[in-house]
Amino acid sequence: LVLLVQRLFGDLLCNTQCAQNFQTLINTQESFMGREVQRALLWVILFGSLFMLWDNYQVWKGGESFFGSVKQEAIEADRSAAAGVPTATVAKTAPALDDATAVKEPIVVTTDRMKVTFDRMGARIVGSEMLLFPQQADWTEVGLAGMVLGREPSPNLGNVKLFDVEGGHAYLAQTGLVGGDYPTHNDEFKLVSQDLALGDKESMKVVFEADKGGLKVTKTFTFKRGYYGIDVDTAVTNTTDKAVTPQIYYQLTRDSSKPAGESSMYSTFTGPAFYTDEENFQKLSFSEIRDKDAKYVEDTNNGWLAMVQHHFVSAWVPPQGEVRHNYTRALGHDLFAVGTLISLKEIAPGATQTNHAVLYSGPQEQARLEQLAPGLELVVDYGWLTFLAKPIYWLLDFLYGIVGNWGWAIVLLTCIVKAVLYPISAAGYRSMARMKEVTPRLKALQEKYKDDKQRLNQAMMELYKTEKINPVGGCLPIMLQIPVFLALYWVLQGSVELRGAEWILWVHDLAMPDPWFVLPALMAATMFLQILLNPKPTDPMQAKVMYIMPVVFSVMFFIFAAGLVLYWLTNNILSIAQQWWINKTIAEERAQRLAKR
C-alpha cells in the first residue's frame, strides 16, 4: 500500500505541471525552510499511518503482524493438547479430531493432475500434491537479487501440496456420520478397490467400507481425467431392525500456518470461507474462529465451504437443496475445523441411502470454479478493486486466447486502455505543452512578485485563464491510470493462470519480480524521457526531486511483479510517443500563427 501511494505521489511530482500548479493553488506565507519541514513531517505521518493500516490489514487477512506473533513453541503445545479433544456426536456439533497428523496406513492415488493420499483411519484425505504446479523459489534467491544477497535457490522444492500432515503441518478433509455410534473420520475403514492409478483411463473409483453401530458405510471416491474435483458418494446401509436417521458431515481441518512458498513481500488470505445464497461469500479469519466471533450463515439449504490460500483452494460442495448446518471449531490454539452437517432421510431396516458431494482441491482456475458451484470463483482474491479487476482479467484472458502469451496480452491491454483514455490524455498533454510555452512568462511573474505571494498567485491564474490552460489538466492522464494499475496489481497477484507465465527471454514468471531488474531499469529510462518532454519546474527543490524520482521508483519496482512493471513501461512508452506528437503538433500550429502575423 505504501509503495503504491508513493507511486501515485511520485508520478505527480515527476509531472512538473502538476507540481507547479498545485503550488500556485496554495497560498502560503511560510518560509521555504518552514514549508520543507512541514512537508517532511507530513510525509512521516503519512507513511507511518499507512504502515499501521497495512500491518492491521495483514493481520485482518490472517497474516502475521510486523511487530511479532505467537511463538511456535506455544502453538505446538496447544496443538498437542487439542489431540485429546473428545469426539462429539450430537446434532449441530462438529466432530473433533482425535489425532490430526497420525496416519495409520497411507494409500496413494495418482491421476494426471494430482497425487492424493488417503488414510485408512476414516478414509480421510491427508495429502494432495499438485503435479502440474511446482513450488516456486523465493524471488530473492534467483537472478540478480540472489547474486547480490548471496542466496542460492532452495533445492528440491517439489510440487505444491494442499492437504498435508507432514512437517508439523495439519491440513486434511474428512467425512463421517453422527447421531449415534456410527463410523466417523476416527474409525478405521477397509480399502475394497484395487485400482490406485488413473493411467490411460478417463475415470477411476477408490472405495472404502466400515461397519459400526448397525450401519455399513461405503465411501466411493471418483477421480476423472483433467479434473481436480473428486466425486464423493457415501452409501449408508441400515443393518439393524429399526429405522435410523443419521447425520453426515463434510469437514476441512487445518492449522493457521501459511502455505509453503508464501512470499515474504506481501501477505495473502489463508483461511476458511462459506458461500450461501443468503450472504454470498464470507471469509473468516482463524482468530475470529478462536475468539468465537466468526460471522457466517449457520442454517441453510445451499452453498459450499472452503479453505482458501494464495492461488489454491480446497472446497466441499454438498448437494444443493438439502438442509444443512454450517459450523466452525477451534481445536486448541492452532487447529481449526469448518464443516457442514446434513440430516439424512430416515433409513428403513435393510435400506441404503446415498449422499453425494464434490471435494475440489486444486488451483483457483476461474472457469473451472464457475462451472463447479455458484460463487466458487469468488475465492480468487482481487481485494477491494474486484469490480475493476474482474473485467481486466476477462480482457486479459481474451487477449491471451488470441496471442497465446500473457506478456503480450498485457502489452495489448495497455494499448487498449491508452486508446480508451486518449481524449482525456490528449487534453492533459496539450495543457502541459502550453504550460511549457508560457514557462518564461511564469518566471517573469515570479521575479516581479517575489515579495507578494498572493499577487503572484492571482497573476498566474490570470495567465492560465488567458492562455486557456487547465492548472491541473496534466494530472488527469496519471490519475486515470492509477485505478487500472492497482487493479492489474491484484490480477497479477491473485490469478493462478498467470503463475509461472513466461513472456520473453529472461522473464519466466510475470507474477514474480523481474529476476534481473531489466524492466524496472527501462521504466526509469522512460520516466527520464517523460521529464525531458515536460515543462521544467521553476522551483530548484522540485527540479531535484523530479530527477531523483525515476531512480527511487525503479528501485521500489524491483519487488513488483514483472507483469505490472511491463504494464507501466508500455504505458510510459505510449505516453512519450503521444506527448511527442502533441508537442510537435502544437509547435507547428504556433509556427503557422507566427507566420500569419
Predicted features by range, described:
Residues 2-5, 26:
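Short hydrophobic transmembrane-like helices used for membrane targeting/insertion
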Residues 9-76, 118, 232-235, 246-269, ...:
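Helix-loop-helix
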Residues 33-37, 99, 197, 211-212:
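Aromatic/His-enriched, Gly/Pro-containing loop or helix-boundary segments
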Residues 68-91:
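Short extracytoplasmic/periplasmic juxtamembrane "stem" segments immediately C-terminal to an N-terminal membrane anchor
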Residues 88-117:
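Intrinsic low-complexity, intrinsically disordered segments
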Residues 92-93, 285, 383, 405:
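Secondary-structure junction/capping motif
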Residues 106-378:
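Soluble non-transmembrane domains of integral membrane proteins
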